[in-house]
Amino acid sequence: MLNFEQFLKKIDQNYYENEFEVRYGQTVMNTLHRVWPEKYKQLSGGEYDCFYNDGLAESTLKLLQKEWK
């Protein structure tokens, strides 16, 4: 599994490859699903699910940083 810094780089890479097609929160959650599917399932549909709300992305990333394996 990637470390947290590599995860952030992967998010940025995915976001800029799909610029203007996918929102940042979507990119965070999609990347999380590929990298750590169990954590994605825990967050999906909850207060830290930033897929539909980019405003939650910062909080989601802070939580993930604390819980990263």
Where are the regions that the model predicts?
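C-terminal alpha-helical interaction appendages
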Residues: 1-69
